[in-house]
Each structure stands twice: as C-alpha cells, then as structure tokens.
Amino acid sequence: MHAASREALARVTSDLDKALWEAKENAIATAAHTGAELFDVVEVLDGDRALRVAVADSAKSAEDRAGLVSAVFAGKVSPATLEVLVTSARELWSNPREFRDGLVTLGRRALLRSAEGQGQLGQVEDELFRLSRILDKEPELTLLLDDRSTDGAKKRELLAKVLYGKVTAVTEALALQVIGRRESNAIDDIDALSKEAAALQGHSVAHVVSAGRLNDEQNQALAQKLERIYGRAMSIHSEVDPSLLGGLVIRVGDEVIDGSTSGKLERLRANLA
C-alpha cells in the first residue's frame, strides 16, 4: 500500500477496534457479522468496477463518497458494517484497489477480534499456520485452490470439505475468504493471517524447523529463550523436516539462526573446500 492508503487504513482500523470494544456484550457477534459482511461487500466491488472506482474517487468530496456508499449498501448490511464502510469512504485512498484491499484487511481483523472475544485467538493462530503447512505439502490441492480458471465458490466448497469439523468457525471463515480473493497466494495469505493473529496477542513469530517434533515443554522453553534474546513475546510456529538430521533452524523476521546438523555439515564442507 502507498502511504496515503496505509494512513487511511490505520485510522479506520482504530475506529473499528473502538466500535467493537464499545459493543461490549455483543462484541463477539458484531465482530463476526461485520467481518462476514465486509467480505460480501468486497465481492460486490470486485464485480462492479464503476462502483469500486466511484467510492474511492479522490476528486469527489468525502461526503459524496460516504453518501454513495450509504445509498448502495444501507439496508443491505448491518448498521455496524455500514459505519465501517462510510468511515472508509470518507478517507483518501491512493487508488480504488487499495480501498478494496483495505476492506479485506478490516474484514479479517473483525473476524480475528471475534476469535479474541471467544478466547480462541491463540487456537486460530495455530490452526491457520498448520493449514498453511498442510497446503504447502499438498501441491495438488493448492494447485486447485490457486487455479484462476475455476469458480471461486467451487474452490471454497472444496476447502470447506477439507476443513469441516477440524478447525474453529473463525479459522474456516478466514481460510475460505482467502480462496478466490488472494493478494498473493493461498499459502502466503493464510500464513500472513496466522502472523496477524499473533500480532493481536502482542507476539512476534519465530518460525522453527526441527528434525523431529518438539513437545509442548520444548516449545515453551524455546519461546522463553527467544523472548530473552529479542526482548518481546514470541509465538512458536514449528514444523518438522527430517532432512535437517538434528538441531533447529529458527527464523525471526529476516534473521535466520541455523543450528541444524545439516547446516553445520554444510558449513564444515565449505570451510574444507
């Protein structure tokens, strides 16, 4: 996103968080409903280029853009969702595409807030990461989900069958909205959502690859050690790669710590060459 759009999104996100907080006992339901409706609105905008351009037209006044959004969506979405749309339309976005992307981000955040209200945010974070790893290891399924020639509804139906009864409702809703509405690809988008869930908990993510599965005690000890190193709370996203032979490879942001046996052997070979 360009600077103007980032600033607009930050302001609307703050307004969304405040509105959900003020909903109090209805916050969970309001957040879930708002998230779902924002994705519905994005579907409408994706299918109507003229409308998508008009609601983010910087040549129009803020009130004109807000009035257009109200005229189109009033009575079709809840008052809470309409308020998010009107607030978004009043902002100046760099281009219509980034306005649309901003609504996607807001919808995702609303669903994550609903998980937070249910005490499920950590579980959703883990489920999203696990799903991204499953898709990474199932290239045939991922190819089907990434196929632009296949109808989005059919792809969502396919993924829904895979997820049915295995994840929380929020995880399923977030995963399904990624399909057919990708900003990059399904694996990267779902992994990014898991990191966003971690960030809402005040955690940074350490991606850990080990030769064997780490148990809960080992994960906790590793998280504590990394927290001392980096000075912030950490979420451990771990996966297994037997080819490492032993040890760990840890990635935090752009920094990589390679303590694997295979890595040590490779460095030894390089030194002997």
Swiss-Prot record:
Localized where? Cell membrane
Q: Does the keyword Nuclease apply?
A: no
Q: Which InterPro entries match?
A: ATP_synth_OSCP/delta_N_sf, ATPase_OSCP/d_CS, ATPase_OSCP/dsu
Q: Which GO terms describe its molecular function?
A: proton-transporting ATP synthase activity, rotational mechanism
Q: Which superkingdom heads the taxonomic lineage of this protein's source? A: Bacteria
Give the keywords, sorted: ATP synthesis, Cell membrane, CF(1), Hydrogen ion transport, Ion transport, Membrane, Transport
| Membrane topology annotation | Peripheral membrane protein
One GO CC annotation? plasma membrane
The record, for HAMAP family, names: ATP_synth_delta_bact
UniProt family annotation: Belongs to the ATPase delta chain family.
Describe its function.
F(1)F(0) ATP synthase produces ATP from ADP in the presence of a proton or sodium gradient. F-type ATPases consist of two structural domains, F(1) containing the extramembraneous catalytic core and F(0) containing the membrane proton channel, linked together by a central stalk and a peripheral stalk. During catalysis, ATP synthesis in the catalytic domain of F(1) is coupled via a rotary mechanism of the central stalk subunits to proton translocation.
NCBIfam families annotated for this entry? ATP_synt_delta, PRK13430.1
Its subunit composition reads: F-type ATPases have 2 components, F(1) - the catalytic core - and F(0) - the membrane proton channel. F(1) has five subunits: alpha(3), beta(3), gamma(1), delta(1), epsilon(1). F(0) has three main subunits: a(1), b(2) and c(10-14). The alpha and beta chains form an alternating ring which encloses part of the gamma chain. F(1) is attached to F(0) by a central stalk formed by the gamma and epsilon chains, while a peripheral stalk is formed by the delta and b chains.
Name-wise, this protein is ATP synthase subunit delta
Organism, by scientific name, is Corynebacterium diphtheriae (strain ATCC 700971 / NCTC 13129 / Biotype gravis)
Give the gene that encodes this protein. atpH
